[in-house]
Swiss-Prot record:
This is Putative regulatory protein Teth514_1762. NCBIfam families: MtxBflmRegRemA, PRK04323.1. It comes from the Bacteria. Belongs to the RemA family. PANTHER family: REGULATORY PROTEIN SSL2874-RELATED, REGULATORY PROTEIN TM_1690-RELATED. InterPro entries: RemA-like. It comes from Thermoanaerobacter sp. (strain X514).
Length: 96
């Protein structure tokens, strides 16, 4: 099993396998999730002081704040999947 990594801005990288959701930070429930994570010590601020544009929720209940748009993070995740799928297809062709 290969490890897939996603750049979430400013040189910060997370494991795609641990990702549960990428959401916008504007809604009240997400703001509540951020505050609860901060109180539990499970908040990771990767914004470098910039405005939070994406909130990333992981399977370990960590909440990661990013200054990159959610759509951008999702596109990076999808491009990683396409690269992996192309690699798998090439490996299958070589085996034949």
């Amino acid at each position: 099993m290969s490890i897939k990594l996603i750049n979430i801005g400013f040189g910060n990288i997370i494991s795609a396998n641990r990702l549960v959701a990428i959401v916008s930070p504007e809604s009240a429930p997400i703001k509540r999730i951020i505050q609860e994570a901060k109180n539990r010590g499970m908040l990771i601020d990767a914004t470098y002081g910039r405005r939070t544009r994406a909130v990333i929720i992981t399977d370990s209940d960590h909440i990661i704040l990013s200054a990159v748009q959610p759509e951008t993070v999702a596109n990076r995740l999808n491009s990683n999947k396409e690269i992996l799928e192309d690699t798998l297809e090439e490996d299958e062709e070589e085996e034949e």
